[in-house]
From Swiss-Prot:
GO annotations of cellular component type: cytoplasm; Holliday junction resolvase complex
Top EC class for this record: hydrolase
Keywords recorded for this protein, A-Z: ATP-binding, Cytoplasm, DNA damage, DNA recombination, DNA repair, DNA-binding, Hydrolase, Nucleotide-binding
UniProt region (Head domain (RuvB-H)), positions on chain: 260-347
GO biological process assignments: DNA recombination; DNA repair
Protein origin, superkingdom: Bacteria
The keyword DNA damage appears for this protein: yes
Small ATPAse domain (RuvB-S): annotated segments: 187-257
Protein name in UniProt: Holliday junction branch migration complex subunit RuvB
Pfam family, one: AAA_lid_4
Residue numbers binding Mg(2+): 71
Listed EC numbers: 3.6.4.-
Amino acid sequence: MKDENSINFLSSNENYLYDKSENELRPKVFEDFKGQANVKETLSIFIRASKERDEALDHVFLSGPPGLGKTTLASIIAFEMNASIKITSAPAFDKPKDIIGILTGLDEKSVLFIDEIHRLRPIIEEMLCIAMEDYELDWVIGQGANARTVRMPLPKFTLIGATTKPGKVTSPLYARFGITARFELYSEIELVEIIKRNSIILNIEIEEDAAFLLARSSRGTPRIANRLLRRIRDIAQVTGSLVVTSDIVAIGLEMLRIDGEGLDEQDRNILRSLILKFNGGPVGVDTLAISVGETADSLEDFYEPYLIMKGFISRTHRGRKATEFAYLHLNLEMKEDNLNENQRVSF
């Protein structure tokens, strides 16, 4: 069951979850999966225990910012459990028959991965909750006085649900997951390990300091590190460089308008808008998002985690505020009242 055929996409619209360009770089076993040490350690224990009892792994809930490896880890879990996996996302379930067809097609101990699980429709979620707990499905046939309920048994399967918005997952659904894990942004050291591993796969020779420079610009996210590594490979190829040096990386980052802190042009637009349009804040996320042409979801899911981690933005009960570090990074002068306010917040 560990061959490529064990990975099944349920909708062509969901292939972004596992596109071919990323597939070659995805680790297949825990040993090759860098970072998220606590998540790997606990999951390894639970997987081993389940295999020793010859049982399906309990349902797993994965949360965290996008691009950190939730889909990859789901595939590794299936591999370690010697199980097949079906990959999809919540928006693919439009009608009850969609989830019924998928659940009844599962094998014993197989894995169903649902990304963006917070976006499930209520009727689909209700059916899924019953399936997760009782391994049965209630299906209503007919209408009105002739309606009757048919109960269908399901194989013991493992549902892996992933989301970037755990707060939007309802309590009844969340309670069905026996294992929960949160992904955190990766450290530079962890990203360097990922870059070195993937440079070998891509047949790239990269110097140590170049790998660190690339890691520093990857926003703590392996998906971004992989994307940048490919672009740097293009530059090295065109310039005739056999080895990726820090100079090559610097040229590439400048072309992509990524600065030394890993901020791209939109990151800087967010900080400039916060400082110049809203006097450093506080300002609500919806207002800030509109000012830079983003949705509140994209601002919260993609941009904010890194800006907060790097200390450029702080969250308060009144809204987002630019920190002193943000002013310094953009070479903007901080007004005295804002400076005093930031000092009060820091203490």
